[in-house]
Curated annotation (Swiss-Prot):
Protein name: Variant surface antigen F
PROSITE patterns linked: PROKAR_LIPOPROTEIN (PS51257)
Source species: Mesomycoplasma hyorhinis (Mycoplasma hyorhinis)
Additional observations: The numbers of repeats can vary and is one of the basis of the antigenic diversity.
Sequence repeat copies, ranges: 55-67, 68-80, 81-93, 94-106, 107-119, 120-132, 133-145, 146-158, 159-171
Residues making up the signal peptide according to the UniProt record: 1-29
UniProt keywords, alphabetically: Cell membrane, Lipoprotein, Membrane, Palmitate, Repeat, Signal
Amino acid sequence: MKKSIFSKKLLFSFGSLVALAAIPLITISCGQTNTDQSQQPGSGSGSGSGTSNGSGSTPTPEQGNNQGGSTPTPEQGNNQGGSTPTPEQGNNQGGSTPTPEQGNNQGGSTPTPEQGNNQGGSTPTPEQGNNQGGSTPTPEQGNNQGGSTPTPEQGNNQGGSTPTPEQGNSQVSK
């Protein structure tokens, strides 16, 4: 009889000790959770204007996305390279700085104004078409896609030969 009363008291006191020890642990864990939540300033906040700034630079108003390390000037397009393009240009994806009113500059050369796209390593003259090869065609020609330099007033030269003036398309090497 005495053993059962003693065992009941022992179980009760052990249970109360466990409960008392669990209360501070629960309080500490809740306090840490609240502390972690309170130590997050600025979460969910953002500055106005709606433009994305993907680097450490601060773009000026009315710009597009700035993904490089440079600060573009206003009213430009996307600046994805390390250079600073001038206003009113298109996309500058290379390491060169194109002049105003040009198209896209995707190569390492600097085309002159009022040209088309320059995708090669050469600098075409004004009022030409697209220059996709390594040669420099003369003005008022068509597209030059080969390695030869056609004479003026010709059509497209897609082969390795140089046709004479007033011919049509030369597609085979003669």
